[in-house]
């Protein structure tokens, strides 16, 4: 298999490469990555003979002109991770999100719609579905798109572009929507590494609003394993919801992180270790994903134990 991965130096993309490159049936991995601020610089697979880094920006004006080059690679699969993903940044400056997440996805679709790739997997988010209240059940495959942040809107737009190419051009697209990922190598702007780094520095963890907002968490390697299942056996044209079946309020999460950190380090946390801050604009209250359909189609897929993987993650930062 020859596989092209966009955003393979990022958090989820790098974990995907780390796993997929171990397979004997993988011949070549091409990583198209712009090397943005969130890219990991030292990756465990970067000296592997199967691996090749292509420093490119999928949203750049030159990128569509690379079509013949990509055709020459004889690719079997494309997995599209590359995205601007930090909600707070999208509120401060949405333009980059429109460029990378929408224009970048469009450029990829145009490059590959007349090639012989077997599958184009577009990795997206559960935030496209908007928010749930405390009484509502999880999102499912029939949930309408109701994005509430510029980030979520840009990902919803890219999802719909992929869907339109599947219907219009018989493009071999698949869409996956995942819940919040966590694990080693995550850029420190995200909630869990923010908490860990604040504890290390003995600074208060900023908690939006009253901390009641709920997120569903999935360990990054579990997400990767789900995506490998989709790559190998997923059906073209389908949309898959991938979650961790672990809904936790932000308030409960920071206390859990604090307790694990204290246990691992032996440090008695006796300072003011968290503080309430002004809530995020348009802060979605709750995300949750119904994973029943995915588990029925892929019964071999298993989820890790949340607290165990959270402890492993904290260890990787300290």
What is the role of each PLM region?
Residues 157, 161, 165, 195, ...:
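Hydrophobic alpha-helix immediately C-terminal to the catalytic Tyr-X-X-X-Lys motif of short-chain
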Residues 131-133, 184-186, 190, 293:
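Short beta-loop-alpha junction of Rossmann-like oxidoreductase domains
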Residues 90, 142-144, 173-184, 195-218, ...:
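A conserved pocket-lining segment of Rossmann-fold NAD(P)-dependent short-chain dehydrogenase/reductase
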Residues 1-181, 313-316:
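N-terminal Rossmann-like NAD(P)+-binding domain of SDR-like oxidoreductases, especially those catalyzing
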Residues 35, 56, 107, 199-318:
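C-terminal substrate-binding subdomain of Rossmann-fold SDR/epimerase-dehydratase oxidoreductases
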Residues 147-154, 184, 188-192, 216-220:
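The catalytic Tyr-centered alpha-helix of NAD(P)H-dependent dehydrogenases
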Residues 20, 165, 194-198, 226-230:
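A short, amphipathic alpha-helix embedded in the catalytic core of nucleotide-handling enzymes
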């Amino acid at each position: 298999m020859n596989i092209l991965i966009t955003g393979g130096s990022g958090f989820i993309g790098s974990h995907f490469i780390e796993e997929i490159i171990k397979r004997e049936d993988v011949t070549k991995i091409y990583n198209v990555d712009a090397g943005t601020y969130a890219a990991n610089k030292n990756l465990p697979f970067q000296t592997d003979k199967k691996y090749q880094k292509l420093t490119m920006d999928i949203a750049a004006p030159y990128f569509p002109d690379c079509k013949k080059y990509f055709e020459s690679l004889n690719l079997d699969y494309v997995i599209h991770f590359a995205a601007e993903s930090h909600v707070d940044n999208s509120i401060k400056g949405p333009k980059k999100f429109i460029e990378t997440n929408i224009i970048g996805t469009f450029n990829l679709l145009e490059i590959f719609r007349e090639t012989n790739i077997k599958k184009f997997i577009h990795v997206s988010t559960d935030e496209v579905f908007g928010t749930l209240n405390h009484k509502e059940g999880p999102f499912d495959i029939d949930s309408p798109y109701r994005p509430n942040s510029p980030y979520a809107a840009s990902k919803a737009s890219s999802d719909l572009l992929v869907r339109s190419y599947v219907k219009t051009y018989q493009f071999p697209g698949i869409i996956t929507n995942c819940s919040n990922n966590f694990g080693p190598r995550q850029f420190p702007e995200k909630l869990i590494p923010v908490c860990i780094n604040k504890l290390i520095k003995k600074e208060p963890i900023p908690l939006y609003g009253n901390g009641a907002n709920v997120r569903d968490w999935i360990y990054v390697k579990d997400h990767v394993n789900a995506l490998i299942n989709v790559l190998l056996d997923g059906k073209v044209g389908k949309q898959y919801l991938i979650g961790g079946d672990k809904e936790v309020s932000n308030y409960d999460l920071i206390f859990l992180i604090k307790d694990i950190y204290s246990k691992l380090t032996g440090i008695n946390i006796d300072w003011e270790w968290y503080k309430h801050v002004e809530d995020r604009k348009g802060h979605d209250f709750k995300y949750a994903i119904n994973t029943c359909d995915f588990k029925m189609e892929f019964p071999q897929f298993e989820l890790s134990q949340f607290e165990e993987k959270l402890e492993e993650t904290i260890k990787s930062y300290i």
